[in-house]
Amino acid sequence: MKTASIILAAGQGTRMRSRLPKVLHPLLGKPMLLYALEAARSASDYAPVLVIGHAAQEVRAAVESAGAEALFALQEQQLGTGHAVMSARLAVPEDADLVLVTCGDMPLLRPETLRQLAALHRENGGVLTMTSVVGDVPRGFGRIPRGANGSILAIVEEAAATPE
């Protein structure tokens, strides 16, 4: 089975309150996006598809100047995560059996984690396999309510979320 990857990097990052695109904020001397690209590339059989939108030229220039391997997909209007993934669909290789989707602002996501996620997906044969974080303070983030057996009931953006 062949694995492809999509990295979402089109958002504005308004919570950061910075003129610099969120994914270009430096971590240990390089933009955090480059860590996400390295992890995705390591876990994929192809160059990652990088979805860019807000400050697209600046993000693209940073990736290219670093010599990172990526294909670019433009999300002209930032209409959410699902729309960002759809913006990348034509750039994903046709022979890919599995597509990993991750975010460009996750510099601590390790290649091993992505490979394990892909392996679990293949073993379980699900339609969708995802990781999530259980946090103490949900403010500032969307929610993933789950059923009694741990199954995903929905993915809810923060603006539409309830305290539960």
Each predicted region: which residue ranges?
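Conserved G/P- and acidic residue-centered "switch" motifs that form tight phosphate/ATP-binding loops
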Residues: 11, 22, 105
